[in-house]
């Protein structure tokens, strides 16, 4: 090192001073450039600068580690504005000269390496020995957040702070090595180097389970949630052995783990805490499972679920029975056959359960088997449950606690037909051979867009509107036996496609579907079929249907049904199998009756009579007709 500045160096210093820098700034910058240069070199440079300017400067005192005292910038000062002096630097004074020289040499070597690589090495050492960062912060005086960012993300850190961190790292390595070396002698404390340090805080490290011990304990918990004392002691030995192997020492030196030594009490507490956590999670799961969820419902489909809304065109002005309101309940008695067994009914209700609106109470479910018929201006109307679960209706003489509300229903008078796709009139266009087809006639004569629910399997998969603009022009002067020569050009089809998972769960196959007359009762229809039949909904070809009225009729199949004094409606299909609908006591189903049968529905003006839901044979469809329709056919 030259003792005299060259002409170029003098010019450079003069240019720096002329640029506005002060003498103190230059001295501090020169000191920060190389904080760990030898004192003689740093002092010679500063003395040369002062000699050039003709000023004198007091010498910087030497530290025990041979480093020059530096003046820190603002970000290196403490929170109260004082200069930052790492406590660990003062602790070096208590070391022997040989130990201090050794640590200084190792620290200087680490400072010359990549800071990010050294940071990862320090972090790995902390994890290996389960050392918390709090211990580093207490010893070095570094900021907790700054230290964490430097170790995890490589955030830059001042050289002097890194020197303090590396000094702690070197000293900790020596302490841990001494602990495991003299573990069997019992002469060492947890912090052998910290008791005599003036800045050491009297705070021991908290016990922390290592990853190796946790893996062993969780495996043991799967086998036995409440181990015995002998089993816990065996786990203690196994955990301590794993911790020693993790640290790279012999299992016989387990006492060197210090505060991380696993004991039987700690194992007992760990199992007790796990049992409490499991019981708490089980309680939460039971509360969530059994708790009421009035506003939640399973989504119909991952797509198009928001389209499940009543058709906007189905207003009370056009269809007087679309939405049910609070009306006086009329008790109804119904009989239906259930020859398919309970398992079929469960399958059907499971498939159709998602159709129920989420806001309905349990007594307002669309599939409720004890739902009563609701009185409406157009006559006594069957609820939706009678359309979806006909053979599950049971007699309930008690009045309803809560009447069904907000049920989307076909306006009556009208006709509902239920038959399989394998029919004489539907087979040419419908491709569904195993499912069921449900047609509900309505009174609206205006074209409108209605929703179509496509059900595949046990969940609703699509929901889309279908527009049917063609209309059927009623002619009440035409005879009832007149056949429609063109397609049934109904206005909107309220189509709900529900392919039953079990083809025989609700409605069995029928040879044909009853044929409807051109009476203006079927301008609006709801059809339940599968996806392949959607394109054929507007091309249905009607056949004939006869309505007669007498006091007593015998069917060709030998079924005899007595009729009361009240007028009755008869529906005849091409097989001349006639079912009678009357007002009277409940009828017993015939042995030949199945769940997919024809039913006529009629309401009477008598307050003592009850509407009947009658079973029939396979060849007849189920039809609901109100009193107005009955009077019009007489």
UniProtKB/Swiss-Prot annotation:
User: Region entry Disordered: which residue ranges?
Assistant: 50-85, 287-319
Give me the positions annotated for DNA binding: 202-282
Motif Nuclear localization signal covers: 200-208
Task: Provide any one GO MF term from the record.
Answer: DNA-binding transcription factor activity
Q: Does the keyword Hydrolase apply?
A: no
One protein family per Pfam: HNF-1B_C
Q: What is one Gene Ontology biological process annotated in the Swiss-Prot or TrEMBL record?
A: liver development
Keyword annotations for this protein? Activator, DNA-binding, Homeobox, Nucleus, Repressor, Transcription, Transcription regulation
Region entry Dimerization: which residue ranges?
1-31
Q: Which Gene3D superfamilies match?
A: Homeodomain-like, lambda repressor-like DNA-binding domains
* Record GO cellular component, one term: protein-containing complex
Q: What is known about the tissue distribution of this protein?
A: Expressed in liver and in oviduct.
Q: Which family does it belong to?
A: Belongs to the HNF1 homeobox family.
**Listed PANTHER family:** HEPATOCYTE NUCLEAR FACTOR 1, HEPATOCYTE NUCLEAR FACTOR 1-ALPHA
Q: What is this protein called?
A: Hepatocyte nuclear factor 1-alpha
Q: Which organism does this record belong to?
A: Gallus gallus (Chicken)
Point out the gene that encodes the protein. HNF1A
